[in-house]
Amino acid sequence: IEIKSTGKFAGYVGLNKLKDDLPPSPCIEIGWRLLKCHWGFGYATEAGKRALKYAFNILHLNEVVAFTTLKNKKSIAVMHRLGMIDVHKNFMHPNIDLSSSLCEHVLYKITKNMWEIFQEE
């Protein structure tokens, strides 16, 4: 993500084929990371919409997932703004210590059909 007015790097949004060691696999994940100074400006949502458009219209995917720790309310809010739904299949991330409060993750998804309907609203 590049800020148009300044040309500065703000972060990234992308699609990723998940490794087999993660519970939602096999699937394609949408993910984002922004520098903290760029949080709250809608950049993740704007770029996420473009990534989903690419996923469904160019790559012809049928479904895209996203996940984050339960504590990451900002990312969960982005998932909602993208039209994604909580599939109620939380999982313990295998690469995070089980004793960590960041281990439990929530799983969201959006299908191509859901995305098309969301675009009409």
Where are each of the predicted segments found?
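Acyl-donor (CoA/ACP) binding surface of acyl/acetyltransferases
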Residues: 2-121
